[in-house]
């Protein structure tokens, strides 16, 4: 990818001459879609990023959000970040995914925080295809290797399979960091005369041009031709960098910081000084390297991993070098900050190779004004399938099957904060410093947003909010990773615009500020574009660290809240469902609750009540899959659903309208009272010790023992 003619003319007009080779490469990368958001930034103003809890919102390496404290708890902040490593994970699934983890962890470090939790949201082609399974295995291995080695637990996430990811999988990784308020730093340069210090791994040639590579469609030969653009990670160096960063903060040696990610040293250093309104003079010869004969462009743009650039006061430079040596990390004093109004200058072998205004380099790219086509609306055209066949196919589909094969590879209890483990609706982390439980949910459903981008994205936000509420937490803040195909195609851009608006509207309705995020476009290949995919990572807060489990106790009554179709008030729709993915057909997307905020807040309140023995949200696969996930060898369930004027048994059991939760409770009347005027409460039956699941709808019955259900749900384990 090279600088376009129009961009080249703009650069020449601004700087008054032809750019040097190094300058042209910098503009090419920093003005790429990956860095400049040229096609997406005009849409992102739809998001509400403000709130009393927001300390630092979008624009930095990670967002900073304050937590409520309980009891004798202290004031604490968390950082939230998310990034994509999509193209690299197709070319090299292990290293592509591993370095995605490393990058988002360093974004956390650059705010002064210590990383305490990861979430991975993964999207692949049809599970039946060998190439999809190869990518799946490699990505999971890369994430588990890197996360386990650095001691950061992967506690939640999602996995989805869809034909349209065959030529371009998605790997979205989110990180939560814990931060004492007084340790907060930013990526905004502070003071002329301060030094720029590069700490971490030596610089090589890996990852060259990674930002521009991520801004193009994947070519047919990408797995071989684009391998040099994929970074190679070293988690052991990352662990040392994490601890070195803590030591630097302990001694208050850091004025500002930036992770070296997209566009490498050139991107990190120019962005840092631009945010501070300063200039800089950098000597590229001073960069510690691991390969000989590197040129200026390679020093600037290599995306070698495990590197940070720090702003350090001159009197503190020697101490920073001592601490870096203690942790066996390289350290180079590469330059210094200069007065406002001066340029970003880089020299190499005594010659000036870059001399430009950092603000123009970082923010001068013109935005794209692209046409968009609204996605077509789908109408009902559904096949007739027996209830047993539908249940077995859907419960055993990779999208609804157990993901234990994935999360059992992760060390999800390191740091001893995880009180609700992977496999539940949301993870729950004990923030003992504040006396606060932090619920964490992340994911999206491509079936939803493929069928209806706007409505599906609203459902993604509601589902993640319902996940944390089902564990008794109130939604607090979110970050998003917006993935789309080639925005130059009007139908693709129309779908992308739909997910942006849908996610923004529902988060606003829920009063959840979207405090940061990432955009990944050009996820397109010879197989076509991906479905528009709005990954959301959302946290909720509660007092204490206990939550009702997903699994039944076998001792209570079962109720579902928010299921208006079972009450005969709405038409159950199968649009975007696993039912239509398995059997074909189309339908409209489910209508969502009118007042989602009241529903979610009441779910959180009820989930924390003493009479609640278990809780589980209803979403992927519908009510039947939710019940199948709740039964186990020690507890079964008997469910009977009466006749309604709306919906066949299949539509009642397999529609995926979010905002519903199944509670096992010893006091159904208390649940009904809590939801009076908020959402309907429908009694389903009882949990018991029958070792089976019986569901009767309109005189049709499903009857399975839990061993058979476990066998159906083990398809990923069985295959891999």
From Swiss-Prot:
Q: Which family does it belong to?
A: Belongs to the FGAMS family.
Alphabetically, which GO biological process terms does the record hold?
Answer: 'de novo' IMP biosynthetic process
Q: In which pathway does it act?
A: Purine metabolism; IMP biosynthesis via de novo pathway; 5-amino-1-(5-phospho-D-ribosyl)imidazole from N(2)-formyl-N(1)-(5-phospho-D-ribosyl)glycinamide: step 1/2
List the catalysed reactions: N(2)-formyl-N(1)-(5-phospho-beta-D-ribosyl)glycinamide + L-glutamine + ATP + H2O = 2-formamido-N(1)-(5-O-phospho-beta-D-ribosyl)acetamidine + L-glutamate + ADP + phosphate + H(+)
Where is the protein found, in the record's own terms?
A: Cytoplasm
What highest taxon heads this organism's lineage? Answer: Archaea
Gene, per the UniProt record: purL
> Organism, per UniProt?
Haloarcula marismortui (strain ATCC 43049 / DSM 3752 / JCM 8966 / VKM B-1809)
Binding residue positions for Mg(2+) 2 = 107, 259
- Can you tell me which residues bind Mg(2+) 1? 83, 518
Main location (coarse class): cytoplasm
Query: What Gene3D superfamilies does the record point to?
Result: PurM-like C-terminal domain (3.90.650.10), PurM-like, N-terminal domain (3.30.1330.10)
Task: State the top-level EC class.
Answer: ligase
Active-site residues, as the UniProt record annotates them: 34, 85
Q: What is its EC number?
A: 6.3.5.3
Q: What does this protein do?
A: Part of the phosphoribosylformylglycinamidine synthase complex involved in the purines biosynthetic pathway. Catalyzes the ATP-dependent conversion of formylglycinamide ribonucleotide (FGAR) and glutamine to yield formylglycinamidine ribonucleotide (FGAM) and glutamate. The FGAM synthase complex is composed of three subunits. PurQ produces an ammonia molecule by converting glutamine to glutamate. PurL transfers the ammonia molecule to FGAR to form FGAM in an ATP-dependent manner.
Q: Mind telling me which CDD domains this protein's record contains?
A: PurL_repeat1, PurL_repeat2
Mention any one GO cellular component term assigned to this protein in its UniProt record: cytoplasm
How is this protein named in the record?
Phosphoribosylformylglycinamidine synthase subunit PurL
InterPro entries hit by this protein? PRibForGlyAmidine_synth_PurL, PurL_linker, PurM-like_C_dom, PurM-like_C_sf, PurM-like_N, PurM-like_N_sf
Gene Ontology molecular functions? ATP binding; magnesium ion binding; phosphoribosylformylglycinamidine synthase activity
Q: Which residue spans traverse the membrane?
A: none
Q: Which NCBIfam families match?
A: FGAM_synth_II, PRK01213.1
Subunit structure as annotated in this protein's UniProt entry: Monomer. Part of the FGAM synthase complex composed of 1 PurL, 1 PurQ and 2 PurS subunits.
């Amino acid at each position: 990818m090279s600088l376009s003619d129009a961009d080249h003319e703009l650069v020449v007009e601004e700087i008054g001459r032809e750019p040097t080779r190094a300058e042209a490469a910098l503009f090419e990368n920093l003005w790429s879609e990956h860095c400049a958001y040229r096609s997406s930034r005009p849409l992102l103003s739809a998001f509400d990023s403000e709130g009393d809890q927001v300390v630092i919102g979008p624009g930095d390496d990670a967002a900073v959000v304050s937590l409520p404290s309980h009891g004798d708890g202290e004031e604490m902040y968390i950082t939230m970040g998310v990034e994509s490593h999509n193209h690299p994970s197709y070319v090299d699934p292990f290293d592509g995914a591993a370095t995605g983890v490393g990058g988002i962890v360093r974004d956390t470090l650059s705010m002064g925080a210590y990383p305490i939790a990861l979430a991975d949201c993964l999207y692949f082609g049809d599970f039946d295809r060998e190439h999809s399974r190869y990518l799946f295995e490699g990505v999971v291995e890369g994430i588990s290797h890197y996360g386990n080695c650095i001691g950061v637990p992967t506690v939640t996430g999602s996995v989805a399979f869809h034909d349209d990811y065959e030529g371009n999988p998605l790997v979205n990784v989110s990180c939560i960091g814990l931060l004492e308020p007084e340790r907060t730093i930013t990526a905004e340069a502070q003071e002329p005369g301060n030094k720029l210090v590069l700490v971490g791994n030596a610089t090589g040639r890996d990852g060259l041009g990674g930002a521009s590579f991520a801004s193009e469609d994947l070519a047919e030969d990408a797995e071989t031709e684009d391998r040099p653009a994929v970074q190679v990670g070293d988690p052991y160096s990352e662990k040392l960098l994490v601890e070195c960063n803590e030591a630097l903060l302990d001694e208050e040696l850091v004025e500002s910081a930036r992770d070296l990610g997209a566009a490498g040293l050139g991107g990190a250093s120019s962005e840092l000084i631009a945010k501070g309104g300063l200039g800089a003079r950098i000597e590229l010869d001073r960069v510690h390297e691991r390969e000989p004969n590197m040129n200026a462009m390679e020093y600037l743009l290599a995306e070698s991993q495990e590197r940070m650039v720090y702003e350090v006061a001159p009197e503190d430079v020697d101490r920073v070098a001592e601490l870096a040596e203690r942790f066996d990390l390289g350290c180079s004093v590469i330059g210094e900050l200069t007065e406002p109004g001066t340029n970003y200058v880089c020299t190499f072998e005594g010659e000036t190779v870059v001399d430009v205004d950092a603000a123009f380099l970082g923010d001068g790219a013109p935005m794209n004004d692209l046409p968009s086509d609204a996605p077509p609306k789908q109408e009902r055209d559904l096949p007739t399938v027996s209830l047993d066949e539908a249940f077995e196919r859907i419960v055993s589909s990779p999208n609804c099957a157990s993901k234990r094969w994935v999360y059992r590879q992760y060390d999800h209890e390191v740091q001893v904060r995880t009180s609700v483990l992977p496999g539940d609706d949301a993870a729950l982390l004990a923030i003992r410093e504040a006396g606060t439980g932090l619920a964490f949910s992340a994911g999206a459903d491509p079936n939803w947003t493929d069928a209806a981008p706007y409505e599906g994205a609203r459902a993604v936000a509601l589902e993640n909010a319902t996940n944390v509420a089902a564990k008794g937490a109130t939604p607090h803040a979110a970050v998003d990773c917006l993935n789309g195909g080639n925005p130059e195609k009007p139908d693709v851009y129309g779908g992308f615009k739909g997910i942006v608006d849908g996610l923004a509207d529902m988060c606003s309705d829920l009063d959840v500020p979207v405090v940061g995020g990432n955009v990944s476009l050009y996820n397109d290949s010879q197989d076509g574009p991906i479905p528009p995919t709005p990954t959301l990572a959302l946290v909720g807060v509660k007092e204490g660290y206990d939550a009702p489990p997903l699994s039944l106790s076998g001792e209570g009554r079962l109720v579902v809240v928010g299921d208006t179709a079972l009450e005969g008030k709405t038409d159950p729709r199968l649009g975007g469902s696993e039912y239509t993915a398995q059997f074909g057909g189309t339908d409209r997307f489910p209508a969502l609750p009118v007042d989602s905020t009241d529903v979610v807040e009441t779910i959180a309140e009820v989930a924390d009540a003493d009479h609640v023995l278990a809780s589980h949200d209803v979403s992927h696969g519908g009510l039947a899959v939710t019940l199948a996930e709740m039964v186990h060898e020690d507890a079964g369930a008997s469910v009977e659903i009466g006749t309604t004027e709306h919906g066949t048994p299949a539509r009642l059991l397999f529609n995926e309208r979010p905002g519903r939760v199944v509670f096992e409770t010893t006091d159904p009347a208390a649940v009904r009272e809590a939801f009076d005027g908020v959402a309907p409460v429908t009694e389903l039956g009882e949990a018991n010790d029958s070792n089976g699941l019986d569901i009767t709808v309109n005189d049709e019955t499903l009857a399975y023992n839990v061993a058979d259900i476990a066998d159906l749900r083990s398809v990923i384990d069985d295959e891999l």
